[in-house]
Amino acid sequence: MNLNRYDLISLRLFVSVVELGSLTLGAKEFGISLAAASKRISEMEAHVGQALLVRSKKGVVPSPAGQAMY
């Protein structure tokens, strides 16, 4: 993943998801589907080689790597 405009959007999405505690709410805030938001976060995780979010039925919280990125 190269640093470009797409990455800036992904980083802003990541921050939104962390602050809202929800991938669904983060996607809504950006006007994109849950699948698109999940794909962007997954691409970021693949780029850094670690999970950035801990997902559960109650929502999401940043992993240790996600906390460092946040």
Label each region the model flagged.
Residues 35, 63:
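Residue-level signal for threonine
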Residues 28-29, 46, 67:
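Alpha-helical residues within the helix-turn-helix
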Residues 15-31:
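Short helix-boundary/capping micro-motifs
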